[in-house]
Amino acid sequence: MTTLTLNTSLLSSRRILAAFSGGLDSTVLLHQLVLWRERHPDVTLRAIHIHHGLSPHADSWVRHCETVCERWQVPLVVKRVTLADNGLGIEAHAREARYRAFAQTLLPGEVLATAQHLDDQCETFLLALKRGSGPAGLSAMGERSPFAGTLLLRPLLRETRKTLEQWAVHHGLCWIEDESNQDDAYDRNFLRLRALPLLQQRWPHFPAAVARSATLCAEQERLLDELLASDLTDCITTEGTLRLSPLMSMSDVRRAAILRRWLAMRNAPMPSRDALERIWQEVALARDDASPCLRFGDHEIRRYQSQLWWIKSVAGQHETTVAWPVWQTPLALPAGLGTVQLVPGGELRRPREEESVSIRFKAPGLLHIVGRHGGRKLKKIWQEQGIPPWRRDTTPLLFYGETLIAAAGVFVTREGAAEDKEGVSLVWHA
């Protein structure tokens, strides 16, 4: 049994990062990729192991993966992740953290390879069916999909778990067993341990038939993508928001399809039918004077200026002040708002020696900004500049002492304008 079972037609890239948990599936994947590398010396192969910290055996799994990778001469990256509660359940938490770590680890020109197989595909389809998903959700997983500016490949997707076991036994491979895989309280484990064995006992080719249905659903989705491409282009702005006016005259079915595709473009979770109805009724059709907001995990859908926005939830920083004692170096902002820095060359004056520098998120009184006559309150300036309400208390305001100098990327005050060529710019990396 030496013929590779992975789909080598996917492996056009010569730089591969393999997801390696140390379990059966990923061990077979990595082993076959090592053999592929032997046949193609120009291939560069790395592995990544995610330490979730959920199991008391997690540290020993790291050591196992290090031993395997050392034996196979595969550089291994170990990433430790922290699972934050986003309301989606432990399985979704772990997956989100895992794929975020993958994205952060990928090098330019590298593709990600994961070890999902035919039985996984069947489980994914049935879970989507349980949620009442449409063709998009029932498309399950593709062998190739866009990911983090590159590709995510699933070279074993046509193979069954049984064939992977046969490969592993034939080649004397060692792998770890995650005890959580035996807990049928998890939906996927329930399917694998209890439901699918019964279905396969009755219909041995059930997983393959399900995979064919998933492929047909995917084809229908691609056709819809083609048919709706023009509508989608008309609806989406350069900022990635969704214009509401074109949707008003669409049928319910067409509008829902546009909403789904827009959310997919924003990397949002696939919404249920009820969720789409709530987006339309509670956000899109809310009163004109309302500021509607619908939470989805750690993101929100909001409406502003007759557009829908998909944004990350951030707590308001209205009362926050961040001192910036060494303004020549970047400053980290709270609540994951990124960093700011003052760089040479720009329209802001430098702070005087006696002036303390800070970042705040509110400013009292009347403000006089460059390019405007008269004074205005900050709220009025935000409105004139078209700054959405949720950004108004999270946009960094630069102060020298008690004097407002600038709002990052929005305006400069007259008191903050440079008087010579030695000015600086306030750069915000959100």
From Swiss-Prot:
Among InterPro entries, the record links this protein to: Lysidine-tRNA-synth_C (IPR012796), Rossmann-like_a/b/a_fold (IPR014729), TilS/TtcA_N (IPR011063), tRNA_Ile_lys_synt (IPR012094), tRNA_Ile_lys_synt_N (IPR012795), tRNA_Ile_lys_synt_subst-bd (IPR015262)
Q: What does this protein do?
A: Ligates lysine onto the cytidine present at position 34 of the AUA codon-specific tRNA(Ile) that contains the anticodon CAU, in an ATP-dependent manner. Cytidine is converted to lysidine, thus changing the amino acid specificity of the tRNA from methionine to isoleucine.
Task: Show the Pfam families listed in the entry.
Answer: ATP_bind_3, TilS, TilS_C
Tell me its EC number(s), please.
6.3.4.19
Identify its protein family. Answer: Belongs to the tRNA(Ile)-lysidine synthase family.
Q: Which GO terms describe its cellular component?
A: cytoplasm
Catalyses which reaction? cytidine(34) in tRNA(Ile2) + L-lysine + ATP = lysidine(34) in tRNA(Ile2) + AMP + diphosphate + H(+)
Q: What class of enzyme is it?
A: ligase
GO biological process, alphabetically ordered: tRNA modification
Residues bound to ATP are: S21, G22, G23, L24, D25, S26
Which Cys pairs does UniProt list as disulfide-bonded?
none
State the protein's name.
tRNA(Ile)-lysidine synthase
User: Main localisation, per the record?
Assistant: cytoplasm
| NCBIfam families hit by this protein | lysidine_TilS_C (TIGR02433), lysidine_TilS_N (TIGR02432), PRK10660.1 (NF007942)
Enumerate the UniProt keywords alphabetically: ATP-binding, Cytoplasm, Ligase, Nucleotide-binding, tRNA processing
GO terms assigned for molecular function: ATP binding; tRNA(Ile)-lysidine synthase activity
The written remark on domains in the entry is:
The N-terminal region contains the highly conserved SGGXDS motif, predicted to be a P-loop motif involved in ATP binding.
Write out the annotated subcellular location. Answer: Cytoplasm
